[in-house]
Amino acid sequence: MLVLASASPRRREILSRFIRDFHVVPSNAEERCSGTPEECAVELARLKAREVYSRVGGTVIGADTVVSIDGRVLGKPSDEGEAYRMLKLLSGRVHRVTTGYCIIHEGKEIAGSATTEVKFRELDDELIWAYIRTGEPMDKAGAYGIQGKAGLFVEWIRGDYYNVVGFPMEIIWKLRELGFEVLSR
């Protein structure tokens, strides 16, 4: 039994493109971390995977995505003001999106991370506030979702697009190496 330890509809949708049969069991793990953005993302993914594995067993995938700039991790905004400050900070600059993952398979942990660089165009206040009013940034690390309206903000990316959405293809390849059938219908 393959289990996705996430409530994210984006992760569920990406995984379903490649693997047909899996269950979704959101994690109840407390999200706390320290260290570099990469260490933080992997630590949070481990916490999620371990918590769900302790309840349901099977093969469990935990993932967590962080946005960082100047070594500072940007989580999900707590309110519109914080969303504005995050988007203003990202405006016209390159930032990093890192997804940590942990797969628990047959009691063993396989953990890693993928990082993608993203450059935003210069964003004026009118555009930032128009985006915030859509409600889209409020449940996303760094206050944006590349797969939605914020795709307009992106000048370029270097790396895995799906990583920026929150589920890098590296996870699919790891599952394939573990014997899970991909691309079957």
UniProtKB/Swiss-Prot annotation:
SUPFAM superfamilies: ITPase-like. Keywords: Cytoplasm, Hydrolase, Nucleotide metabolism. The active site is at D64. Signal peptide: none annotated. One of its GO terms (biological process) is nucleotide metabolic process. The keyword Hydrolase applies. The keyword Hydrolase applies. Its main location: cytoplasm. Its EC number is 3.6.1.9. It is found in: Cytoplasm. This is dTTP/UTP pyrophosphatase. It comes from Thermococcus gammatolerans (strain DSM 15229 / JCM 11827 / EJ3). The lineage of its organism: Archaea, Methanobacteriati, Methanobacteriota, Thermococci, Thermococcales.
